[in-house]
Amino acid sequence: MYQRILLAYDGSASGQQALLDCHEIAQWSGSELTLIAVMPLPLNNLGLEGGIYNETLQETEERRYRAILDTGLRKLGDAGLKADGQVVTGDAVSEITYCAQKIKADLIVVGHKHLEGWAARWWRGSVSKALIEQAPCSVLVVITH
């Protein structure tokens, strides 16, 4: 029986499905839910073209990730579930693992979309694959096509 579930939520189609599955598991088990939205690290003071990093862009991204998280929390609330949530900044796998340890999660739920072609898989990598290797607890990978 799960007591604490951590959902890494990004608002994507696979994230939406993970939210639905997480909702069902939490209802069934009476688990505490925590949602996190992981925002990538800013490029320090340099942009991709070597220019100065735009602080306004960083604030816009923070608002965007906060809106994604709030949408997930609202959907769970509408379904009668209480959940905590936070936006974190950093490497997705490191931040998810850290948060899972911090809240003593016994299940991490993530969405995953199968990518077509080896180049897409190589370029993008797989957070879920790396997470399975590093997670301090069980990981449920919700797959969409």
Which stretches of residues belong to each language-model region?
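Glycine-rich, Arg-bearing micro-motifs that act as flexible, cationic patches
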Residues: 110-133
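Conserved beta-strand positions in the Rossmann-like core of class I SAM-dependent methyltransferases
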Residues: 34, 84, 140
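Short, flexible loop segments at boundaries between secondary-structure elements
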Residues: 137-145
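Small/aliphatic-rich secondary-structure junction motif
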Residues: 3-52
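Short, hinge-like loop/turn segments at secondary-structure boundaries
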Residues: 51-54, 102-104, 126-128
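A short acidic, glycine-rich active-site loop
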Residues: 53-67
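Structural beta-alpha unit
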Residues: 74-108
